[in-house]
Design a protein with these regions (language model features):
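Short acidic-hydrophobic, aromatic-tinged amphipathic segments that line or gate anion-handling sites
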Residues: 35-44, 120-131
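Acidic/glycine-enriched connector segments
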Residues: 1-59
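Glycine-rich, charge-decorated loop segments at or immediately adjacent to ligand/cofactor-binding or catalytic sites
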Residues: 2, 94-107
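Active-site/ligand-binding-proximal alpha/beta "capping" segment
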Residues: 38-87, 143
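Short loop-to-beta-strand entry elements in the cores of soluble alpha/beta enzymes
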Residues: 81-93, 118-120, 148
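Short gly/pro/ser/thr-enriched loop/turn and capping motifs at secondary-structure boundaries
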Residues: 20-25, 65, 93-97
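Conserved thiamine diphosphate
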Residues: 47-58, 107-126
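SAM-dependent methyltransferases
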Residues: 121, 128-225
Length: 225
């Protein structure tokens, strides 16, 4: 968390700490700041940092790192939080996340505990520059989504072309509940989000189940790197 605070600067940062009888102290970039919040329970701390984050970059760590990574992946897998990029950043010649990825594929996927599409919820990266490019690409066109009644509204920076809409309807029909993906104006139910009012939109009859496939769809919406 210190790296995030250092990069953003104190004015643009907030901290979510945990009360422990040992080890845990706020880093010097956020220490004594009124935007530093200390929690008694890990689950409330995770709830807050997941709610406010636009991306997650996980570095090698201990049980806490594994706990947070599993929490975020589970929330995305089940649609309980906004779709965001999740990146596993390995240190040079370390292989920490490569070994984790191998375990996930052999033990979880191999035993049928997760689906093939769930592997799309995270990406492996080798350095900071690669992580930055992945995050920038994720938001190069896609911005956010919102469920309105039975449909999902996907907000975009650029207007969707007819060829893109046709491609999405062809390649992602397996996650549609009926009807087709189409362009739409902002819906009345979105009036409480004025900051997103001017964005372009797709109306998607998403089945609310295959969130790994939804992550694949976002990659297509953003186009080639």
């Amino acid at each position: 968390m210190q790296a995030g605070h250092e990069g953003a600067g104190r004015e643009q940062s907030f901290g979510v700490n945990i009360h422990l009888p040992f080890e845990q102290q706020a880093n010097r970039f956020i220490r004594n700041d009124p935007k530093l919040v200390a929690f008694h329970f890990f689950f409330t701390r995770k709830l807050i940092f997941v709610k406010e984050a636009d991306a997650f970059v996980f570095f090698p760590g201990g049980f806490g790192t594994q706990d947070e990574a599993a929490e975020v992946l589970t929330l995305l897998q089940t649609g309980k939080t906004q779709m965001v990029p999740i990146l596993m950043l390995d240190l040079p010649n370390n292989g920490y996340w490569r070994e984790w990825d191998d375990f996930v594929r052999r033990r979880m996927l191999g035993a049928g505990y997760i689906s093939e599409e769930d592997l799309s919820l995270f990406k492996m990266v080798e350095n900071v520059e690669e992580a930055v490019k992945e995050i920038q690409h994720f938001y190069s066109n896609y911005q956010s989504l919102r469920f309105v009644k039975r449909d999902m509204v996907v907000r975009l920076v650029h207007p969707p072309t007819p060829s893109l809409i046709a491609e999405l309807n062809r390649d992602f029909r397996d996650i549609l509940t009926g009807g087709e993906i189409r362009e739409t104006a902002a819906l009345p139910e979105e009036a409480d989000e004025q900051a997103a009012w001017s964005l372009h939109r797709l109306l998607v009859p998403f089945n609310r189940r295959n969130f790994g496939r939804l992550r694949n769809m976002i990659d297509v919406i953003n186009g080639p790197r």
